[in-house]
Amino acid sequence: MDTFLFTSESVNEGHPDKLCDQISDAVLDACLEQDPDSKVACETCTKTNLVMIFGEITTKANLDYEKIVRDTCRAVGFVSEDVGLDADNCKVLVNIEQQSPDIAQGVHGHLTKRPEEIGAGDQGHMFGYATDETPELMPLSHVLATKLGARLTEVRKNGTCPWLRPDGKTQVTVEYFNDHGAMVPIRVHTVLISTQHDETVTNDEIAADLKEHVIKPIVPEKFLDEKTIFHLNPSGRFVIGGPHGDAGLTGRKIIIDTYGGWGAHGGGAFSGKDPTKVDRSGAYIVRQAAKSIVASGLARRCIVQVSYAIGVPEPLSVFVDTYATGKIPDKEILKIVKESFDFRPGMIAINLDLKRGGNGRFLKTAAYGHFGRDDPDFTWEVVKPLKAEKAQE
């Protein structure tokens, strides 16, 4: 059997780039909660003892930006300089301006356009991907790396592994078989975990705890064998972490946010952006399209691309490729997709309820992936049943 190796990585919520994503989305949530028509483009950067948020926000919401920043850092676990950042004593800089009136008139006519008339907030192209290799219809390498990262945070916060600190990275290599275009996972080849830790713990204890409390509950036994390689804190020391170890920036983890290197990516990040930004809303609707194609049995694996021009509601192009796994020709699936999904940004916002913030709705997306999550707030994960005969009508 001819097999190949494919690797996906993840970082958990204490990684400086991911901290920035979460702060940007916490700001978005707060804006949308008070004013669903908020226009938000919020970037965050961080380094030792400093967090800065900057960007363009037009909103009726009355917000305490500094409090949002500190609350988000504290919730992640950055409560002292020892762990990489002290949420209550770090410096917080805020440099937020209004959305450019040039953009506002072109995209939403200063809030006068009807939903179906709202133009894309920018040009760009976005991809959605789905594969039948996991129940989530997501790539296994990505699912395992992501779940290991989430589990790392869980055992830190519930006290199972008190030596853990917030920052950490995971990476999983899976051996695959290509079954006529569909991906079939055979085994897990390598598991890599690098996690921040305190001064009290030995490397042997780290390895033992990670195997017992993180890997064992997450990686199904059927994928592990005596040849599986484990790299557990291979650098030997990771005490300094978070923004103290590395600078962080919103939008630096777009592959972790999506499909772990599978499919394709148009380059646009998600966090801190309201739904007129097609980087986010466009990527969400094509995930729903790709997932619906696979869930409906039209293909075993699928990628969907959409593209936009600033100020124009209708997409410039829609593309479907099923990697030769389609039950009907790709051009027929494309026809079904165009009939079943409305790709206009204003309509995506309505159909996926993307103007609803609050309750950490978008904050939740900002760590452990935007796709393949079992949570009613992730409206783009709802499958639309698609029927083959639709194309023949």
Swiss-Prot record:
Source organism of the structure: Vitis vinifera (Grape)
Catalysed reaction, written as an equation: L-methionine + ATP + H2O = S-adenosyl-L-methionine + phosphate + diphosphate
Signal peptide (from-to): none
Keyword list, A-Z: ATP-binding, Cobalt, Cytoplasm, Magnesium, Metal-binding, Nucleotide-binding, One-carbon metabolism, Potassium, Transferase
Family classification: Belongs to the AdoMet synthase family.
Pfam families: S-AdoMet_synt_C, S-AdoMet_synt_M, S-AdoMet_synt_N
Record's keyword annotation contains Magnesium: yes
Positions bound to ATP: H15, D167, G168, K169, S235, G236, R237, F238, D246, R252, K253, A269, K273, K277
Entry binding sites for Mg(2+): E9
High-level lineage: Eukaryota, Viridiplantae, Streptophyta, Embryophyta, Tracheophyta
Residues engaged in binding L-methionine: E56, Q99, D246, K277
Pathway: Amino-acid biosynthesis; S-adenosyl-L-methionine biosynthesis; S-adenosyl-L-methionine from L-methionine: step 1/1
This enzyme's EC code(s): 2.5.1.6
Subunit structure: Homotetramer.
Cofactor(s) essential for the protein: Mn(2+); Mg(2+); Co(2+); K(+)
Enzyme class: transferase
GO biological process, one term: one-carbon metabolic process
GO cellular component, one term: cytoplasm
UniProt KW Nuclease keyword: no
Gene Ontology molecular function, alphabetical: ATP binding; metal ion binding; methionine adenosyltransferase activity
Binding positions (K(+)): E43
Cofactor comment: Binds 2 divalent ions per subunit. The metal ions interact primarily with the substrate. Can utilize magnesium, manganese or cobalt (in vitro).
Name of the featured protein: S-adenosylmethionine synthase 4
Localization, UniProt: Cytoplasm
Record's function text: Catalyzes the formation of S-adenosylmethionine from methionine and ATP. The reaction comprises two steps that are both catalyzed by the same enzyme: formation of S-adenosylmethionine (AdoMet) and triphosphate, and subsequent hydrolysis of the triphosphate.
